[in-house]
């Protein structure tokens, strides 16, 4: 929404001339009604999607959820009451309803701006301070920041709108009109426009520019890293030495030809796995290493002992068993494999950086769409606010009405931005609209399963 309503700048304006024809009234009513319906439907889809699809329950999407709540309030109350105001040509619902509408409208509008600032700062710190910031980036902290954004918006607008007339001792709002009393002076309206629109937009654009520059720098670093890799070396090779660990002291090794009578099931060893999580914008590598700290690229293969059934009975003699053969890198093996490990480490680092870059670009794309929609829909009205400060009669009444409504349209566009830039939102919207949401298991499945190596058992 906007920072000030048209009557706040020109209190003596008749909102809609009573002489409007029935076709004009019908056109305005149908158009605004459809916009209100689209706004409510779109933002309800966002809320329901967040509820049913656990893949969307991420820290970044908590801010989008808060923004959708503000847009839902605007679509449900602000749009419809303003349409009534336009069609009737005067405010007929009383002074209390007027003040409550204005308070709700301005609190929700300011909360939208605050949420956009939170999204911008969240993306900025995630890109520029990935280690320190993401350690503190939890759902609880996100909820706290969202709560503060709404609290600040409420404190700034609601008390002043509701109680200003009691502070000054009289109500100066003209009969049949609805606007904020303390914004009747153009200079005050100009100040609120600067603080509530131009300053936040400047901060958002600056942060987005910094995010763009940082993302481009990372893309160049990734290209340089990938270009320095040597193909065909160190893809999965590891040099290791085998050490025999007897099952008991003094027991000889099992002859090569001996067959086990009891075979263990195959063991699964995970060398590394990708974690893809919308909440974290980077993939993380996990390595299975020995207790002595092998490098992530090394592979540990444990062969379980094959114990004879007869040897399991209690006896004074130590049981005979096949040796525990542990295949693990040694210092000597590492020295020989040093050249092969480096390319593998670079390959894993390149994969991690690629995944991080993809996530950052996707989040930046969503942010850019939201910011672009916000700037395009809010700028015309706020330009008219500046013009009216120096020339009261230079802005036609029709432009005021269009500019005011265009601010509302931003709440209609935001859910479309989520769907266009986020495949998870888009797929969930489609399933909900087709009434097929119950046919899908809303459970997050890792998109990059870990690479699992199977150690085969001995064949009898």
UniProtKB/Swiss-Prot annotation:
Composition bias, Basic residues: 328-343
Pfam families for the chain: 7tm_1 (PF00001)
Subcellular locations according to the entry: Cell membrane; Postsynaptic cell membrane
The UniProt record lists the keyword rRNA-binding: no
Keyword Cell inner membrane: no
The protein's name in its UniProt record: Muscarinic acetylcholine receptor M1
Record note on quaternary structure: Interacts with GPRASP2. Interacts with TMEM147.
